[in-house]
């Protein structure tokens, strides 16, 4: 049996983090979402076909040494069904299909027992997903895409993991494209439901559909809480390390710094002196966190510099960023209500604590503050003394004009 993992989409709801990388390559607890998925299935399959598109080179470069993996290019993203069809000539038997942005802990053993099956997750907000209704013997009897609350008949949702027979390719080829001109895998599932040939299998462990920035932070926190301490880097005098902490070889923790796990600090990173790294934080390769700076509950991508007297909380900071002294990310509203984030032009309630979401190659001057939930597009420059309270598009230059009054000193 082989597997198909769908990795071609642009992940626009996760901009600016996905402006320059595929969503499956976002790191969760130090490794890409896609690597987590592959680790769950690679012992069950002979070949893994990654359907790639946007920024495909970053996926290929990372996984190039895995002999089980082959790549299929989806030149135009015309739906999940179309993505599966691109693998038709490579699949000769039953196969798995997985969305490249779902992260889960449960074994897939049970789903393999059926000819056609979809994994299910039980959630509190099923109206935001494709809802699955089960009948006798775990047969799927209905699938509703993002129904209204009054239409809900189940708390089970489509978890984006499927085991299918080869014959599903024939169903996909005969589907009528949607109004958007796309061929959707869920439409093929509905055909299987009509003939009573689709079963549902509940996932009992952790599952997360990484669709929003706060989902990234939530998943990161969950998997960081599974790590086991391993200190391989250089630790200077008077450093306090508590909880489970991984410090890779080549990392340096300078004197009088405090690290509270779960935390991962990857190779080449320098922390301190007098820095404070709080729980649920990951510093990717070659980061710098300077004197008297504090990082809490955040993901800091590689080659980023957060210098002295700065605070980054509940934030995602892209690669190759360089902040000025006293950069602050606010992460909490006065009224303690969920932070509102602009997602594809619409205000969306996120979580109670959320800082800034900053793309790659962003530079800020001294004393820049970011209000909760703001997004800063890649390759932007933020001038000194700015308070950023709204989203900034990529390739922007933001600066503040203050009138400087100069007069002669009176005797």
From Swiss-Prot:
Enzyme class: transferase
Binding site for N-acetyl-alpha-D-glucosamine 1-phosphate: 80, 130, 142, 158
InterPro entries: Bifunctiontional_GlmU_arc-type, GlmU-like, Hexapep, NTP_transferase_dom, Nucleotide-diphossugar_trans, Trimer_LpxA-like_sf
Region N-acetyltransferase, annotated ranges: 225-411
Superkingdom, taxonomy of origin: Archaea
Listed CDD domains: LbH_G1P_TT_C_like, NTP_transferase
Annotated binding of acetyl-CoA, by residue: 384, 401
Region annotation (Linker) ranges: 205-224
Reactions the enzyme catalyzes: N-acetyl-alpha-D-glucosamine 1-phosphate + UTP + H(+) = UDP-N-acetyl-alpha-D-glucosamine + diphosphate; alpha-D-glucosamine 1-phosphate + acetyl-CoA = N-acetyl-alpha-D-glucosamine 1-phosphate + CoA + H(+)
Family: In the N-terminal section; belongs to the N-acetylglucosamine-1-phosphate uridyltransferase family.
Name of the protein in question: Bifunctional protein GlmU
Species in which this protein is naturally found: Methanococcus maripaludis (strain C5 / ATCC BAA-1333)
């Amino acid at each position: 049996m082989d597997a198909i993992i769908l990795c071609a989409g642009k992940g626009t709801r996760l901009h600016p983090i996905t402006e320059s990388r595929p969503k499956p390559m976002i790191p969760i607890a130090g490794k890409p979402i896609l690597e987590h998925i592959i680790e769950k299935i690679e012992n069950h399959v002979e070949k893994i076909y990654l359907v790639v598109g946007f920024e495909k080179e970053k996926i290929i470069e990372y996984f190039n040494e895995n002999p089980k993996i082959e790549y299929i290019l989806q030149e135009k993203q015309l739906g999940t069904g179309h993505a599966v069809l691109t693998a038709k000539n490579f699949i000769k038997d039953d196969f798995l299909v997985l969305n490249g942005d779902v992260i889960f802990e449960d074994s897939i053993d049970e789903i393999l027992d059926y000819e056609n099956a979809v994994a299910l997750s039980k959630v509190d907000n099923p109206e935001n997903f494709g809802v699955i209704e089960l009948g006798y013997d775990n047969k799927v009897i209905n699938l509703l895409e993002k129904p209204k609350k009054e239409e809900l008949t189940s708390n089970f949702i489509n978890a984006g993991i499927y085991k299918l027979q080869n014959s599903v390719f024939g169903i996909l080829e005969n589907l009528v494209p949607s109004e958007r001109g796309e061929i959707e895998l869920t439409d093929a599932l509905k055909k299987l439901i009509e003939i009573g040939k689709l079963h549902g299998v509940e996932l009992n462990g952790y599952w997360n559909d990484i669709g929003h920035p706060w989902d990234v932070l939530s998943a990161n926190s969950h998997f960081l809480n599974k790590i086991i301490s391993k200190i391989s880097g250089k630790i200077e005098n008077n450093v306090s390390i508590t909880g489970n902490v991984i410090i890779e070889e080549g990392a340096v923790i300078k004197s009088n710094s405090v690290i509270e796990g779960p935390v991962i600090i990857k190779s080449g990173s320098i922390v301190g002196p007098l820095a404070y790294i709080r729980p649920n934080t990951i510093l990717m390769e070659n980061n710098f966190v300077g004197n008297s700076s504090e990082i809490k509950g955040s993901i800091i991508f590689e080659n980023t510099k957060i210098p002295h007297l700065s605070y980054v909380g509940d934030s995602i900071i892209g690669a190759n960023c360089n902040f000025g002294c006293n950069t602050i990310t606010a992460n909490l509203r006065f009224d303690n209500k969920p932070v509102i984030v602009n997602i594809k032009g619409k205000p969306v309630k996120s979580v109670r604590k959320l800082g800034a979401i900053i793309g790659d190659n962003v530079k800020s001057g001294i004393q820049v503050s970011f209000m909760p939930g703001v997004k800063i597009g890649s390759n932007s420059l933020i001038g000194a003394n700015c308070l950023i309270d709204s989203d900034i598009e990529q390739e922007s230059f933001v600066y503040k004009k203050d009138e400087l009054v100069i007069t002669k000193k009176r005797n």
